[in-house]
């Protein structure tokens, strides 16, 4: 994990010692919360990580929503765990098909980054 508060020195160590995947925490917040960092700041951190080792895959997570996801098209991947949990939970409460509702949401999000 690399957080917005991670120093450049520590970032280099994490990238060097990591396997092929690095999780970039987009902001300091609770899961499912709104972004407190700007998309520009998050992308600058992403570019810094990639500049240390371009071969590492970096996924961005924490605060990614349908309104912000389009800003992160250059990322190797995005984590939207809380959004998925909300869709599943709401579908169950409404006695709807969670898989169908999740598929609809994921197609919408995918269309915003491709």
Features from the language model and the residues they span:
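Active-site-proximal loop/turn and secondary-structure-junction residues that shape catalytic pockets
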Residues: 4-6, 28-29, 64-66, 84
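Glycine-rich phosphate-binding active-site loops on the catalytic face of alpha/beta enzymes
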Residues: 23-33, 74-94
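Catalytic cores of alpha/beta
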Residues: 6-16, 52-53, 60-78
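Active-site-adjacent beta->alpha loops and helix N-cap segments on the catalytic face
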Residues: 6-13, 31-48, 67-70, 89-100
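C-terminal helical cap(s) of enzyme catalytic domains, especially alpha/beta-barrels
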Residues: 83-114
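Surface-exposed amphipathic alpha-helices with a cationic face
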Residues: 42-54, 106-114
């Amino acid at each position: 994990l690399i957080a917005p508060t991670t120093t450049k020195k520590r970032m280099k160590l994490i990238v060097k010692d990591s396997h092929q995947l690095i999780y970039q925490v987009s902001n300091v917040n609770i899961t499912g919360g709104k972004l407190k960092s700007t998309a520009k700041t998050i992308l600058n951190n992403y570019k810094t990580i990639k500049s240390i080792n371009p071969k590492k895959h970096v996924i961005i997570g924490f605060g990614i929503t349908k309104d912000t996801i389009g800003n992160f098209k250059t990322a190797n991947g995005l984590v939207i765990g809380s959004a998925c949990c909300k869709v599943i939970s709401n579908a169950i409460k409404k006695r709807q098909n969670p898989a169908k509702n999740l598929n609809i949401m994921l197609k919408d999000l995918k269309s915003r980054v491709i």
